A protein has these predicted regions:
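Class I S-adenosyl-L-methionine
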Residues: 1-32, 37-134, 220-222
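Short gly/pro/ser/thr-enriched loop/turn and capping motifs at secondary-structure boundaries
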Residues: 56-59, 84, 143-146, 211-213
Length: 228
């Protein structure tokens, strides 16, 4: 079977084995008090926890958020998940590693910051796991933009208006919307602000919502002077 994302051949699931369950858990914006009760209950009884990192030797905000609730006997692994075509071999090894754990009957938690279905590594993982008929359960988490809106006391959307959510490199997608959420804007913050001001938007920028060093910035000057 070929994975639809990276065209690597995988073995099919062994129907004679009793597989564990993969739990994709969203831990919210990065504050342990914002984990759901369901997430905590699963963490307390899981056998394995896998926390993806965006960089080799990187840390995991998701793991730091969940660590106080993880079963003391659970195995914990930090895994680098580069979602790029040239990194197929590394991605393949990570997938196979998790499949092996599941085939041993272990219940495996895959942590994500925010919600598992919003700009998450879990989305790629889920497609692979579905193709192999593995046991999966997804636990939602509070998204970063919902957390940010709460901190800033800023309405996200109202009535029957649409809400557009986009990354900072897709400003061309902005048409006549009244409500926007722009994520992953840090590489082109000036262009983002220029576009918002051109379109007549009022804006607020929230960084590290509910985490140490959180900032709520309401002017262009504050945003441009803020250090990441």
């Amino acid at each position: 079977m070929k994975d639809i994302h990276n065209n690597i051949e995988f073995e099919n699931r062994d129907s004679n084995k009793k597989y564990g369950t993969l739990y994709g858990i969203g831990v919210g914006p990065g504050n342990e008090e914002l984990l759901t009760i369901k997430a905590v209950k699963i963490l307390e009884r899981c056998d394995v926890v896998i926390a993806p990192t965006a960089r080799e030797q990187g840390e995991s905000i998701a793991l730091n958020t969940a660590k106080n609730f993880i079963n003391s006997k659970a195995e914990i692994y930090l895994k680098y998940f580069p979602m790029k075509k040239e990194k197929e071999a590394e991605i393949y090894e990570n997938y196979r590693f998790m499949e092996k754990l599941l085939s041993e009957g272990k219940n495996v938690v895959f942590l994500t910051i925010g919600d598992p279905f919003v700009y998450s590594t879990y989305i790629y993982l889920l497609e692979y796991m579905k193709n192999h008929n593995l046991n999966i359960e997804t636990v939602p988490g509070i998204t970063s933009f919902c957390a940010a809106a709460s901190l800033a006391e800023q309405t996200l959307v109202i009535g029957d208006e649409p809400l557009l959510i986009l990354p900072g490199n897709r400003l061309d997608s902005i048409k006549d919307e009244k409500y926007l959420v722009i994520m992953k804007y840090y590489k082109n913050v000036e262009q983002v602000l220029d576009k918002l001001e051109e379109k007549g938007f009022k804006y607020v920028c929230v960084k590290r919502a509910y985490r140490e060093g959180q900032e709520i910035l309401r002017t262009r000057e504050e945003i441009l002077n803020s250090k990441d």
